[in-house]
């Protein structure tokens, strides 16, 4: 599998997790020039923008440690455009992070809510 296919695999796993938690998935892989949102979902009155990361070897950092300031800035830009394009001003924006780690042949999903001030 190439890098993009692997990314889709982890996003599908994250989407399954979110659906089980009651989230309504609105969009996947929303892209603008200079930014991308992996998953957009609704959780009650919240419009949730989710960044998904995977690590099979955490010796180089956990999934959450891979989100740098440049990624945060591009994510904020994409969020503003998404809200404007879809007229979703009535929902409270929230940024969540899903980190997927592989240990042996098992996968662990870590979900962190409200990780980025908006």
Swiss-Prot record:
InterPro entries for this protein: Restrct_endonuc-II-like, tRNA_endonuc-like_dom_sf, UPF0102_YraN-like
Q: Which CDD domains match?
A: PoNe_Nuclease (cd20736)
User: What molecular functions are annotated in GO for this chain?
Assistant: nucleic acid binding
- One family from Pfam that matches here is UPF0102
Task: Tell me which HAMAP family the record gives.
Answer: UPF0102
Instruction: Please name the PANTHER family in this protein's record.
Output: UPF0102 PROTEIN YRAN (PTHR34039:SF1)
Return the similarity comment. Belongs to the UPF0102 family.
Put simply, this protein is called UPF0102 protein CHY_1414
| Lineage, opening ranks | Bacteria, Bacillati, Bacillota, Clostridia, Thermoanaerobacterales
